[in-house]
Regions:
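Contiguous beta-strand/loop segments that form the cofactor/metal-binding neighborhood of enzyme cores
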Residues: 1-50, 79-89
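C-terminal helix-rich "cap/oligomerization" subdomain common to oxidoreductases
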Residues: 12, 81-127
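Short beta-strand segments
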Residues: 17-19, 63-65, 95
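A short, polar/proline- and glycine-enriched secondary-structure boundary/capping micro-motif
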Residues: 28-33, 54-59, 65
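Generic recognition of short, well-ordered alpha-helical interface segments
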Residues: 31, 74-77, 107
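Short, surface-exposed beta-strand/loop "edge" segments at domain boundaries and coil↔beta transitions
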Residues: 42-44, 61-64
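Generic detection of short hydrophobic beta-strand segments and adjacent strand-loop junctions
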Residues: 65-69, 123-124
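Active-site loop of classical SDR/Rossmann-like NAD(P)-dependent oxidoreductases
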Residues: 68-80, 97
Length: 127
């Protein structure tokens, strides 16, 4: 499927990260899910851009805790946090990441894309 990106990497700390991005659903609405796994933990954020629901499983407990965030607009919250911090320096805590981290994340997504494109090109040129 040409609209799929999948990447797995290992951090210097030894932790493993992975990303899958797929554009495959038909229709107007789209589906988003973010999964985070750590030793004993599972966090799953579903429908992040419409009616976000966070499912949390903790070490030693098979139950999933469910947190619903009605009427949450992550794009609005992100921009509002930045504007509030510019207008009132006491609100800087609302910015949850540094510009440097954001720039490195963006560069990382491009590295994933370039590696994927190089892989596809190599497949087309192999005997």
């Amino acid at each position: 499927m040409p609209r799929v990106t999948s990447a797995t990497w290992k951090y210097e700390s030894g932790a493993v990260g992975s990303l899958m991005h797929v554009i495959a659903l038909h229709g107007r609405d789209f589906f988003t899910e973010i999964d985070v796994f750590a030793d004993g933990y599972s966090l799953r954020l579903c429908d992040a851009y419409n009616a976000p629901v966070l499912y949390v499983r903790r070490p030693g407990d098979d139950r999933e805790e469910v947190y619903k965030y009605d009427d949450d607009d992550p794009f609005f919250s992100e921009v509002a946090g930045m504007i509030d911090a510019v207008e009132d320096p006491s609100q800087r805590h609302r910015i949850l990441t540094s510009y440097d981290d954001a720039a490195r994340t963006y560069a990382f997504t491009w590295a994933i894309r370039r590696a994927s494109e190089a892989c596809v090109a190599a497949r087309h040129h192999s005997p």
